[in-house]
Amino acid sequence: DPMLAITARRGMVLNLTDKATAAIVIKCSNGWDAQNILDLANPLADFGLNKDDYSKLEIKNAEKYGCETAGIGLAKVARLLPAALIAHIADNDASVLDSWATRHGLLVVDAGDVFQYEHTQARTLKAVSEAKVPLLDANDTRIIAFRPFDGGLEHLAIVIGEENLKKDQPVLARLHSECFTGDLLASLKCDCGDQLRSAINEIALAGGGVLLYLAQEGRGIGLVNKLRAYELQDSGLDTIDANEQLGFDADERIYLPAAEMLRQLGFEKIRLMTNNPDKINSLAACGLNVVERVA
């Protein structure tokens, strides 16, 4: 029988679990259609399943590194809702599975590769192009584009006042997660655009530094899901609660890409412009020396 895998975060929102497990799996009952499944996965769906029926659902915890959790991981990579419809195949022989998948036009992915995907992307980042791009508040600017081996998400290093930077001295740095609505459209829902331009100006006034523009829209959930979260916020939820309603953690970002970019640029000591201690701790865990927090 097919099963629906959702994050434990989404399960707790639905009162289907009170445990901080990796994910939960729900058996799809006879007579269910796509709408019933969507009701459980998407808080914005029209509920066709009576909440009184939740107590009748057959639920189990998913293994932390099992295929159900990997299915959710694939959905996150694709910037979809963090849920997956799972069907087990009886034969576990790899050659048989490959043959079966080929006949049905399906892709075979190893669960381990899914769990390591974000780290693999970060570890394989390479600078692929660069150009001098004078900015309004920082005329001496070079932008370097980094891309992982699979051609996935691109991150940008905006290096300002390069001639003043010394590799043996701490570099003034800012990590900025991309925000289409704030950076480009001046959305009133956030101050990301103001933060971006202020950071560029401050780095230029300080003589130089680097701003990393990271492809982590919506705290790592992607633009489509961020718009879903905005719709939930319009009903009274804050940013964190809205993300959790969708089944995401409060913050899905990792900062290994930032650490790898700084390392490749030759900067091991950082004066980090942030009010977020998670960024400091994450860079330190990646082997960089954050010598100062600049508020």
For each predicted feature, which ranges?
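Catalytic domains of riboflavin
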Residues: D1-A295
